[in-house]
């Protein structure tokens, strides 16, 4: 998928680009919406930032917006690989948080209805309940085991892996990788247009170093 491999594994994480419901300010969750035209363009810009890296494989969630972002990244990289290539895996463990009864509702209208404290609890809290949906803690409970089983062994073997997921599934993984305390999770963000790069040694289950790369975009309603 051209920094060549060294003894260190590399995990590059990207949030999907702007989706149709991001543009509208709606809680999307498991609703399978497409990228906007702007999002598709920005995904190719992300790919341009990764032309120096030779990936051994890629992972996305089961949802179209991550698959379409990966397709754009591949296009931007000018890589000789297709989105149905055997090196690419899609899995629901990486899906966005299920927002339950809030799915499809405008975030800012809900904020006006319930107040800022409850809104921030729902949006950024660690174990804040959402009627019919998931907490971030529950997302962590599915993302981390999948990472440890499917992705970590490849990183420890020195492979370079690209992961395209969602704001909350990435935040959950960041908690694990960076040892972030539960009480600090409200401050953890995964911005659009940002690439997180974690480097792994063969004997380590957690990254030793972290870098970031960014494209210059106008962020949508996260």
Please describe what each predicted stretch is:
Residues 118-138:
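Short glycine/proline- and acidic residue-enriched helix-loop micro-motifs
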Residues 10-14, 59, 89, 159-165, ...:
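Beta-strand elements within well-structured catalytic alpha/beta cores of enzymes
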Residues 2-9, 59, 215-222:
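Non-catalytic terminal regions with compositionally biased, polar/charged low complexity
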Residues 26-34, 105-107, 136:
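Short glycine-enriched, charge-decorated loop/helix-capping segments at active-site entrances
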Residues 3-6, 44-119, 175-199:
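Phosphate-coordination/substrate-recognition cap region in phosphate-metabolizing enzymes
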Residues 167-171:
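GST superfamily/GST-like fold recognition
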Residues 29-45:
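Short catalytic helix/loop segments, enriched in acidic residues and glycine
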Residues 15-20:
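Short polar catalytic/cofactor-binding loops
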């Amino acid at each position: 998928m051209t920094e060549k491999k060294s003894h260190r594994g590399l995990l590059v994480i990207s949030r999907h680009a702007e989706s149709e419901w991001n543009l509208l300010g709606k809680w999307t969750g498991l609703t399978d919406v497409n990228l906007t035209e702007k999002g598709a363009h920005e995904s190719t810009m992300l790919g341009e930032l990764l032309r120096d890296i030779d990936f051994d494989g890629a992972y996305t969630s089961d949802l179209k917006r991550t698959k379409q972002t990966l397709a754009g990244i591949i296009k931007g990289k000018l890589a000789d690989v297709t989105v149905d290539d055997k090196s690419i895996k899609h899995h629901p463990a990486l899906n966005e948080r299920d927002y339950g009864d809030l799915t499809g509702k405008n975030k800012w209208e809900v904020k006006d209805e319930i107040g800022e404290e409850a809104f921030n609890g729902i949006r950024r809290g660690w174990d804040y309940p959402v009627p019919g949906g998931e907490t971030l803690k529950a997302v962590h409970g599915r993302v981390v085991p999948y990472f440890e089983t499917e992705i970590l062994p490849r990183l420890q073997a020195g492979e370079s892996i690209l992961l395209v997921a969602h704001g909350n599934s990435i935040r959950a993984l960041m908690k694990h990788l960076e040892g972030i305390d539960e009480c600090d999770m409200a401050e953890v963000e995964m911005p659009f247009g940002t690439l997180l790069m974690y480097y792994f040694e063969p004997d380590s289950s957690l990254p030793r170093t972290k870098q970031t790369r960014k494209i210059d975009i106008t962020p949508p309603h996260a």
